[in-house]
Regions:
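Conserved active-site alpha-helix within GNAT-family acetyltransferase domains
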Residues: 102-121, 227, 251-271
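Cytosolic beta-strand hydrophobic patch enriched in CBS
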Residues: 54-58, 186-190, 245-246
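Conserved acetyl-CoA-binding loop-helix of GNAT-fold acetyltransferases
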Residues: 82-94, 213-216, 222-239, 259-264
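A conserved beta-strand-loop-helix scaffold within acyl/acetyltransferase catalytic domains
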Residues: 38, 44-45, 68-72, 164-217
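Acyl-donor-binding surface of acyltransferase catalytic domains
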Residues: 1, 63, 70-143, 274-278
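C-terminal "cap" of GNAT-fold acetyltransferases
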Residues: 125-146, 243-259, 265-280
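Conserved GNAT acetyl-CoA-binding A-motif
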Residues: 94-103, 237-251
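Short amphipathic alpha-helix that is part of the acyltransferase structural core
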Residues: 1-41, 138-169
Length: 280
């Protein structure tokens, strides 16, 4: 314990619980992290890469910071009332690249005191927001397409083809066991031949929802399916008490399609991720 702070390393599921606890307590539209997407990022590959280090810090029994070293790139969250802890987090990390939200100005300044300066990539993620009042009513799907309950096999299949990755049914079952997963927020559309065509998953914490992920099979794109699935998930989130929703998409011009699709649903950019680098 240093300076009244207790660090816990590589705690497995306890780490995720600590991350979600802090993200929920600190959530605002100036926060990078929503508790729901943390659950998704933790479980989407069946758990974190064993080579990636994690830690969280407590002060008087309360989680006040967490850090996730993802192969030499740091993701973190730090209670603004405990910015003095920045030195310990940076020392634990020992690396050179940190990603933050550009609205986290106090954290950016604190990291700057330890040599980190903004140096953005050509690629970055934008954060978009929309209120959940005034959502359009559900429209009919294209001929032959239907809604289907989100069984794990179908959801893993659509995620795999939509994002060009391999996700197993067992991994998706793990996602469905996450405490914050709600099946009514998990929307699945199937094609006329019964194969999965598009999906959207929302997560709700308090009055804020986040969409993560949204995807469409390449052969079924440009039919409005991702938009329909997203709106269905947002309506379900509103029914659970959410008042606003956020989604992240590439904000650079190298991949504008997703951002444009969300803007067509009424989302507007309000912040972006920023990369901070400390010279070697």
């Amino acid at each position: 314990m240093t300076g009244g702070y207790q660090r816990v390393d590589d705690a497995g599921p306890e780490q995720l619980a600590a991350m979600r606890d802090l993200a929920g307590r600190l959530w605002s539209w100036s926060s990078r992290w929503h508790p729901g997407e943390l659950a998704w990022f933790w479980y989407e590959h069946g758990g974190p890469d064993p080579a990636w280090r994690t830690a969280y810090w407590r002060h008087r029994g309360e989680v006040v910071a967490w850090a996730w070293d993802r192969g030499g790139r740091l993701d973190l969250q730090l209670d603004p009332s405990h910015l003095a802890l920045t030195a310990q987090v940076v020392a634990w990390f020992g690396g050179h690249t940190v990603t933050v939200l550009d609205a986290e100005t106090e954290l950016i300044d604190a990291l700057g005191e330890h040599g980190y300066a903004r140096r953005d990539d050509d690629r970055f993620f934008a954060h978009l927001r929309r209120p959940l009042d005034g959502l359009p009513a559900a429209a009919p799907l294209p001929d032959g397409y239907t809604w289907r309950p989100p069984d794990a096999a179908a959801r893993a299949a659509i995620h795999s083809v939509a994002f060009g990755v391999t996700m197993s049914e067992a991994v998706y079952r793990g996602i469905q066991r996450a405490p914050s997963y709600r099946p009514e927020l998990d929307q699945l559309i199937v094609a006329p031949d019964g194969t999965p065509a598009a999906s959207a998953l929302a997560w709700v914490d308090g009055d804020a929802a986040v969409l993560e992920p949204v995807g469409t099979s390449p052969e079924h794109r440009r039919r409005g399916l991702a938009g329909a699935a997203s709106l269905a998930a947002l309506r379900a989130a509103r029914d659970l008490g959410a008042r606003d929703a956020r989604v992240c998409a590439r904000g650079d011009d190298g991949y504008p399609a997703a951002r444009a699709a969300y803007e067509a649903l009424g989302f507007r950019v309000y912040a972006r991720n920023a990369r901070l680098v400390r010279p070697a």
